[in-house]
Amino acid sequence: LVTMHRRENQGQPMRAVFGALREMVDQEPTIEVVYPVHLSPAVQEAANDLLGDHDRIHLIAPLDVLDFHNLASRSYFIMSDSGGVQEEAPSLGKPVLVLRDTTERPEGVKAGTLKLVGTDPTVVKTTMTELLTNESLYLQMANARNPYGDGRASERIVQAIKHYFGQGEAAEEFHEGEKE
């Protein structure tokens, strides 16, 4: 699964990533790519020019959040420049190759759920190859502790309210980076 739309990546950086992606799909017959293409004319043009005629690269319309999460959960890994995807994918156990040189989500890099790749085509291809061929690396990223939560916030809120009213023990705290 690929998403790429940031203005900073439009133009040559985006074209470089798309070229690398196409080369990887050409070299590896088992790779299928789904790319919900952003509505930006610059993104549409680059995607259609470089990826549009490949039978294993599927350019589709942008998805609503439920359909996107459904697709992401069925993906092997995700390549994206989206901050939201960087936060959501770890909840699905999906490694993310971040198509940027920096991120506003350094906790994801620190936890091991994200890897900064940038837009250099050589780095993109090398990192994709590593994730596709190194099962240990894949499992390490896929099973890393989600730094954005463990899915138990509602339980903790209910427990905290009960505790406040003297109806139970204090809620267990979430500690970023600790594996259960």
Describe each model-derived feature in a short phrase:
Residues 1-35, 40-180:
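Nucleotide-activated sugar donor-binding and catalytic core shared by glycosyltransferases
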